[in-house]
């Protein structure tokens, strides 16, 4: 699984048989994108470098800003992944951090402890490694992510197929599609009775975290409000009308020749 996200492995000529559409990014190349075309590394990599005993390093993901921190309910759960699921391995979710700054020799090489404080500071926490690297070996402080980025890949097509079959009340067919993905991940297969919409949404986290546009998935499946209230402690006040965004007033005002009402709940 982790091989798909290693630098230079995203394209089919490199042997990646799961990629469907890959954004082509080339470091220091005209037309290859700059530091801001793909912000995923800055968003997903912890600010470990801001913790005493650490220094910027390509193998730790470079200069992350930790703008997106995974919720503890899944990434620190003991039963969210099967014990054999490779998507939960250290290669894919970094849970062990070791001090690497030679200027603090008393700490160098020792394990760093993840605590509620390091999580609240966004410095040390279990981190998704999909967005590590990306030309950071040239300059660990480089803010961009010029690693080619997969936008569509085969696993998601199977999960979309499973979603469609669930909506058709074809649980056996949904389980069959989900199991294609789980077999590749060395996870146990599921039965038709387990192929629910909630299981599918959990499977999309296991497979596609950081890749899918999660809000769109939850809106499409009618689960935005329910799962936000259940799993996001900071957004318990979400309401059904929040399924839609408010329409900017400038857009409403520009439609002078037609009635253009605001979405419900925002008047």
Outline where the language-model segments fall.
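Charged alpha-helical initiation segments
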Residues: 123-137, 176-179, 183-186, 205
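Short, cationic low-complexity segments
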Residues: 38-68
């Amino acid at each position: 699984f982790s091989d798909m996200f290693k630098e230079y492995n995203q394209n089919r000529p490199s042997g990646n048989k799961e990629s469907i559409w890959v954004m082509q990014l080339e470091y220091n190349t005209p037309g290859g994108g700059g530091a801001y075309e793909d912000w995923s590394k800055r968003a997903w990599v912890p600010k470990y470098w801001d913790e005493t005993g650490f220094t910027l390093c390509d193998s730790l993901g470079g200069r992350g800003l930790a703008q997106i921190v995974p919720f503890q309910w899944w990434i620190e759960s003991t039963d969210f992944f099967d014990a054999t699921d490779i998507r939960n391995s250290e290669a894919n979710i970094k849970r062990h951090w070791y001090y690497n700054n030679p200027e603090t020799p008393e700490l160098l090489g020792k394990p760093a402890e993840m605590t509620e404080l390091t999580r609240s500071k966004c410095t040390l926490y279990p981190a998704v490694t999909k967005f590590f690297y990306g030309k950071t070996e040239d300059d660990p402080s480089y803010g961009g992510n010029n690693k080619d980025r997969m936008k569509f890949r085969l696993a998601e097509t199977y999960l979309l197929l499973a979603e469609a079959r669930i909506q058709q009340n074809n649980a056996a067919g949904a389980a069959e599609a989900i199991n294609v993905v789980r077999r590749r991940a060395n996870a146990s297969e599921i039965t038709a009775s387990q192929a629910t919409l909630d299981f599918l949404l959990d499977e999309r986290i296991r497979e596609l975290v950081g890749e899918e546009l999660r809000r769109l998935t939850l809106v499409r499946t009618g689960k935005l409000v329910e799962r936000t209230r259940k799993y996001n402690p900071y957004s318990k006040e979400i309401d059904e009308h929040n399924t839609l965004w408010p329409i900017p007033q400038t857009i409403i005002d520009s439609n002078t020749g037609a009635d253009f009402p605001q979405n419900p709940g925002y008047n």
